[in-house]
Amino acid sequence: MAIRKYKPTTPGRRGASVADFVEVTRSTPEKSLVRPLHSKGGRNNAGRITVRHQGGGHKRAYRIVDFRRHDKDGVPAKVAHIEYDPNRSARIALLHYADGEKRYILAPRNLQQGDRVENGPGADIKPGNNLALRNIPVGTTIHAIELRPGGGAKFARSAGASVQLLAKEGAYAHLRMPSGEIRLVNVRCRATIGEVGNAEQSNINWGKAGRKRWLGVRPTVRGVVMNPVDHPHGGGEGRTSGGRHPVSPWGKPTGRTRSNKKASNKYIVRRRTKNKKR
């Protein structure tokens, strides 16, 4: 993809940019793979806000994406279309399997309409193919990685994300995550070759607040401009710095949320890099 910039015809257009969608080959999704999606506006079943800054936005339909693929080992597929998905930053690819079934997968970089995709231990090492980590050579760039065997892809699913397979020792593989963290993952877990496409997504300049509202993102108000009743940083005469280390509206310190007693800490070889530029 590429980024298309607008001329400054209005204040909202000044500096704004959009994706050119040149890789998208079809505008309507596969009807059998679409389900209704009801907007919650950040509310739970009691009607209380549990996730702030959510609400509104354009109505969406959910595309069912296959994050497992293990039941299609040995069945070749052809890429029928590359499509836009409003529910994620990556594009999705519609596969037509040789047995007649249709499924969506995340579209890797350089995957094109008409390409052949395979799953299982006999698959070639090329973008879009899905294999177990034990069958992938060291140094390969991968994405859509399972955390537990058969559990479905959990890591590296957003646009431009990729993980590097550093080593394999016994039952575990060493993976370098996009954050810089090095983590152990069982070699029976599956991953897809290549990196997720649409990497330029992070370079889009939204231009105006309204475009974020179309996506269902509501404003984020700083605590220092609130009243004391609303936030620990609120109040004071004139502009203030908050007077303390940053905290949440409920007084919890920001950052450093991972517990030292978390059971999965033993699978982290090296913690993620601090202040990593994104």
Curated annotation (Swiss-Prot):
Gene Ontology cellular-component terms listed: large ribosomal subunit
Modification(s) after translation: The N-terminus is blocked. Phosphorylated on serine and threonine residues.
GO process terms (BP): cytoplasmic translation; translation
Pfam families on file: Ribosomal_L2, Ribosomal_L2_C
Keywords: Ribonucleoprotein, Ribosomal protein, RNA-binding, rRNA-binding
SMART domains: Ribosomal_L2, Ribosomal_L2_C
GO molecular function: rRNA binding; structural constituent of ribosome; transferase activity
UniProt region (Disordered), positions on chain: 29-55, 225-278
Compositional bias of kind Basic residues: 258-278
Family matches, as HAMAP family: Ribosomal_uL2_B
Family: Belongs to the universal ribosomal protein uL2 family.
Summary of the function given for this chain in its UniProt record: One of the primary rRNA binding proteins. Required for association of the 30S and 50S subunits to form the 70S ribosome, for tRNA binding and peptide bond formation. It has been suggested to have peptidyltransferase activity; this is somewhat controversial. Makes several contacts with the 16S rRNA in the 70S ribosome.
Quaternary state and interactors: Part of the 50S ribosomal subunit. Forms a bridge to the 30S subunit in the 70S ribosome.
Protein's recorded name: Large ribosomal subunit protein uL2
Lineage: Bacteria, Bacillati, Actinomycetota, Actinomycetes, Kitasatosporales
